[in-house]
Amino acid sequence: CYLPAKEYVTPKVDVRAVIFNEKNEILLVREKADGRWAMPGGWSDVGYTPKEVAVKETREETGLDVRAERLLAVIDKRCHPYPAGPFYVYKMFILCEVLGGVLSGSFDILDQGFFALDNLPPLSLDRTIPEDIRMMDELRHHPDIPFHSIRMDSIQFPYTPFHSIPFG
């Protein structure tokens, strides 16, 4: 049983799939809501693990089948340069590997594609900011880092985590 929001307010969880191809391009989807681009993903659903959300959202938004590889980062949206919004949000970024499928649309996605990191389209800034993409590109090259949960402006590489959590 879940308590109504008026009883105990908790953060919403936004899960994003981080997917790069062999050309080092990142997969983005064009959101119907604002016509701008973001990493595949969305609100976490009750009954799904974060890994399952990343896989489900990627399949629904892109037509691709992926495997969730590892958690790259958990961030508190208010500690990063996102526009103000109505919810308190934690964002989870999960590195995924493409297993198959064909890029195809969905009811709430206008388009999808892979983009070079130095030639990104206009981003849906409530969902994905340029700093997200830069940080995920850096973190994916450091498998020794279990996950990242500190402020983006304080990250330095090589990064030695002071804590870790299992993911799998």
Question: In which residue ranges do the predicted regions lie?
Answer:
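Acidic, metal-coordinating catalytic segment for phosphate/diphosphate chemistry
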Residues: 1-16, 22
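Generic secondary-structure transition motif, activating predominantly at the C-termini of alpha-helices
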Residues: 2-7, 79, 133, 137-141
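Short connector loops at helix/strand junctions that flank enzyme active sites
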Residues: 10-15, 32-34, 87-91
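Residues embedded in well-ordered beta-strands
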Residues: 16-18, 25, 93
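Conserved Nudix-box catalytic region and its N-terminal flanking loop in Nudix hydrolases
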Residues: 21-60
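Nudix hydrolase/Nudix homology domain
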Residues: 36, 107-168
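Unchanged
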Residues: 44-68, 75-132, 168
